[in-house]
């Protein structure tokens, strides 16, 4: 994901360059699931820069914790980031149980701060309803970025994403085999 962290690839002003950077990342992960079918999970992190602003960050982190928190705490940051948000205020801001309803509120609140939800946060939330979040820590060895651990169960990836990033790879392998069979490779 570090290849996508670069701000110039996240901007809608970058046009197709930004679209393909993230799309290529997902295609590569889809290929891994085909080449290594015993893989059951993707484990990684979402990165936010300190320049993002603590108010917007805290809104996003609260939303992720409310809807995707790993209650078993199988992984925890050694030194967790302590959000500065007012818990009572955020509970009132996000009163709904439905992710979609609270997501609309999150998007509006973050935009009101002059920011956007980071593209990878959106992308991960749209991969699977069973995504798990493990907490956030500051990486003092990489520009003091804030990294939130996540886990995606491959079997739970939405069919639409599976079709786009896994099945397209399977189809390309089938085509390659057809070309080889007819000596066209």
Q: Where are the regions a protein language model picked out?
A:
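Acyl-donor binding region in acyl/amide transferases
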Residues: 1-131
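Intrinsically disordered, low-complexity, positively biased terminal segments
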Residues: 85-185
């Amino acid at each position: 994901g570090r290849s996508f962290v670069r701000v110039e690839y996240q901007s809608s002003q970058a046009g197709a360059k930004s679209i393909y950077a993230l799309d290529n990342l997902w295609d590569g992960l889809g290929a891994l699931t085909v080449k290594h079918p015993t893989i059951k999970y993707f484990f990684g992190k979402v990165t936010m820069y300190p320049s993002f602003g603590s108010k917007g960050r805290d809104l996003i982190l609260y939303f992720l914790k409310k809807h995707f928190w790993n209650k078993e705490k199988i992984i925890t940051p050694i030194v967790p980031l302590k959000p500065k948000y007012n818990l009572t205020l955020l509970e009132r801001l996000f009163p709904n149980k439905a992710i979609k309803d609270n997501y609309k509120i999150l998007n509006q609140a973050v935009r009101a701060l002059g920011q956007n939800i980071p593209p990878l946060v959106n992308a991960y939330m749209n991969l699977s309803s069973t995504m798990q979040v493990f907490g956030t820590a500051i990486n003092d060895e990489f520009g003091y970025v804030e990294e939130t651990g996540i886990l995606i169960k491959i079997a739970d990836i939405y069919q639409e994403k599976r079709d786009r990033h896994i099945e397209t790879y399977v189809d390309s392998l089938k085509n390659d085999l057809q070309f080889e069979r007819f000596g066209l490779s």
